[in-house]
Amino acid sequence: MADESPVLVEVEAGVAVVTLNRPQKLNALNAALWAELDRRVEELGASDAVRAVVLTGAGRAFCAGADLSGGDGRRSATQILESYEEIAKRQLRLWNLPQPVVAAVHGYCLGRGMELALWCDIVVASADARFGEPEIRDGSFVASVIPWLTNPQRAKLLMLTGDTITAQQAAAMGLVADVVPEGGALTAAKQLAGRLAHLPSGAARAVKRYVGAVQELQGLVAAQKYGSALAALMRSLTAEELGIEELVRIREAQGLRAYLAARDAPFAR
């Protein structure tokens, strides 16, 4: 019987492999997955036996983003802000892990899933990986780490168009450290993490703190707080205010698949 936990953890030779485990939903992030991932991250951070971490996804994708299957409901602006602030805190906890964290990305890596990968220290992607942040097409956006990993023009191009890009394109932008053949991301990430696990732990932590301090001096953490508030404001607007009434009608009448097709059609290249 398959393990039903939304997050699986295996530790071998000092390397913890953390697997997002909702393959039937392309590992889309729901409340249960977020909570379990956060709990596991805290456990790993306190473990002396773990010297490096690999984050991956079960099945055909790393993570397709936030789980949209249940709709967003009609939450208040305050509730949305609290939710987004909690997500930001969880991303920062992953970023602040004392151990090096390597993301092993295959298949879809979109929206919140893309951000999850980019908050890791190093991203290894297989050639079939696809990255993107399509939320802009819904009248929203994600408070992103992308502007700290590439130049502002490229960040705006990706975030404004909502386009999906290949692993090779992501590497050219500085979002991915290494592209490996299809099916090879997890193996390559585990090999890299195995090498990192041999580092003196104090030295590895010092490097992480140093690079993190540079990003903080560039405003990363403060911008996440501002971005979370701005994203929550956008999410709290009505369909009429966002100008997406027709898309909402399509979703209500025809379902999520039809909604996504109608949303993305004007952006086809």
Task: Kindly give the residue locations of the regions a language model identified.
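C-terminal alpha-helix plus adjacent terminal tail
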Residues: 1-13, 166-167, 187, 198-269
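Conserved CoA-thioester-binding segment of acyl-CoA-metabolizing enzymes
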Residues: 1-58
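Terminal peptide-recognition signature
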Residues: 18, 22, 36-37, 55, ...
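A short, glycine- and basic residue-enriched loop/turn
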Residues: 23-26, 60, 65, 128-130, ...
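Charged catalytic carboxylate motif
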Residues: 32-36, 86, 93, 188, ...
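Glycine- (often His-adjacent) and acidic-residue-rich active-site loop
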Residues: 49, 57-93, 109, 249-255
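Crotonase-fold acyl-CoA enzyme core
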Residues: 92-204
